[in-house]
């Protein structure tokens, strides 16, 4: 038996889609509203009678834990209102929750991004399933699931896929949200000045706002405090730091990321950012080798880093070096990627 626990506020545009996709897959729905002024509560009551109000106190973990406390089941699944279940393997979930409760379950979340090359997907594995006897939420913002009483625990992937339908809107149009996140994270850091995760999240917030100098400072603070490479956020911290240095044109400084090679040598996203760093340092041979290595990975977080984005950048390198035929071969391997199609048109090969 498992309960879905959600915290919501002014989510009338998203909540119905989320709940109708999950209602027949779980045993209980618990919804905590933190101050909606729209029809969110009305929509929630169509799907469950366990709808509660929580006075907002600038603490996401407090709201999450309040929702968990009101669940009748020990096993908890957490979703946000702008997430909709795309695939749900009930058999895999049942098998997971019938094991030892001292484990976290990670689900796959697919976000849609948009840049100059068009839309692409960002895939994350995020811990969202836990037993409330052994775990709780911690952190006023970007809250994390943490063990109670320092129990030893495992992290396992559960075969559930969720589409985050609000990601693009969040990133592009959420200046108010970014400002709120900055304020809460800075407040949290004052209380926990040696928490590398908080510096990482503040760095991500500045990165989202394209304030790369402040992003760099906070990513460096996180790394200086020491990051266990087994932490879920460690890889993204290192890769985001790499992209920050590229945006700041600090290409030589970015070569310092080579020291993480041993930990992430088979990760497409890490190899991709390293390839970009080599490319911007005019080390084209190493860059091509890294891009080619990206294509050997079966999985990636950012869509295309193990396929068409790698081929596109190899094509750019060959074109710059005067090897037009090789460039064309790699551009054509990109299929319908718009930037590659543009290069083929300019080379009169389309």
PLM features: residue spans?
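Short aromatic/hydrophobic "clamp" motif used to bind/position activated sugar donors
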Residues: 76
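Conserved donor nucleotide-binding strand/loop of the catalytic core
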Residues: 27, 42-66, 70
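Catalytic-site signature of metal-activated, phosphate-bearing donor transferases
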Residues: 62-68, 79, 85-210, 214-217
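A conserved acidic beta->alpha catalytic loop
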Residues: 21, 33-42, 56, 80-83
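Acidic helix N-cap motif at the loop->helix transition within catalytic regions
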Residues: 16, 38-47, 88-89
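Short, well-formed alpha-helical segments that are part of the catalytic scaffolds
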Residues: 5-25
């Amino acid at each position: 038996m498992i309960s879905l626990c959600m915290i919501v506020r002014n989510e009338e545009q998203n909540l119905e889609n989320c709940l109708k996709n999950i209602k027949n897959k779980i045993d209980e729905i618990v919804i905590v509203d933190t101050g909606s002024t729209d029809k969110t509560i009305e929509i929630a009551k169509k799907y469950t009678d366990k709808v509660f109000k929580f006075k907002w106190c600038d603490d996401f973990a407090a709201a999450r834990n309040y929702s968990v406390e009101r669940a009748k089941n020990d096993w908890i699944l957490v979703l946000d209102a702008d997430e909709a279940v795309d695939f749900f393997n009930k058999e895999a979930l049942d098998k997971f929750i019938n094991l030892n409760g001292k484990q976290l379950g990670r689900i796959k979340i697919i976000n849609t991004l948009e840049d100059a090359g068009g839309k692409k997907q960002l895939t994350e594995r995020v811990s969202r399933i836990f037993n409330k006897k052994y775990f709780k939420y911690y952190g006023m913002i970007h809250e994390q699931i943490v063990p109670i009483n320092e129990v030893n625990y495992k992290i396992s992937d559960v075969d559930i896929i969720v589409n985050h339908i609000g990601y693009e809107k969040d990133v592009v149009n959420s200046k108010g949200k970014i400002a709120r996140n900055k304020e809460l994270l800075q407040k949290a850091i004052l209380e926990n000045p040696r928490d590398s995760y908080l510096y990482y999240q503040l760095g991500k917030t500045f990165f989202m706002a394209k304030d790369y100098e402040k992003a760099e400072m906070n990513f460096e603070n996180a790394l200086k405090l020491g990051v266990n490479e087994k932490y879920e956020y460690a890889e993204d911290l290192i890769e985001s730091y790499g992209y920050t240095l590229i945006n700041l044109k600090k290409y030589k400084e970015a070569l310092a990321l080579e020291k993480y090679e041993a930990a992430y040598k088979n990760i497409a996203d890490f190899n991709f950012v390293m390839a970009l760093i080599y490319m911007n340092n005019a080390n084209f041979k190493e860059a091509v080798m890294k891009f080619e290595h990206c294509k050997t990975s079966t999985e990636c977080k950012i869509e295309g880093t193990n396929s068409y984005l790698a081929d596109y950048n190899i094509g750019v390198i060959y074109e710059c070096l005067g090897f037009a035929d090789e460039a064309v071969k790699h551009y054509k391997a990109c299929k319908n990627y718009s930037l590659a199609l543009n290069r083929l048109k300019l080379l009169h090969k389309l």
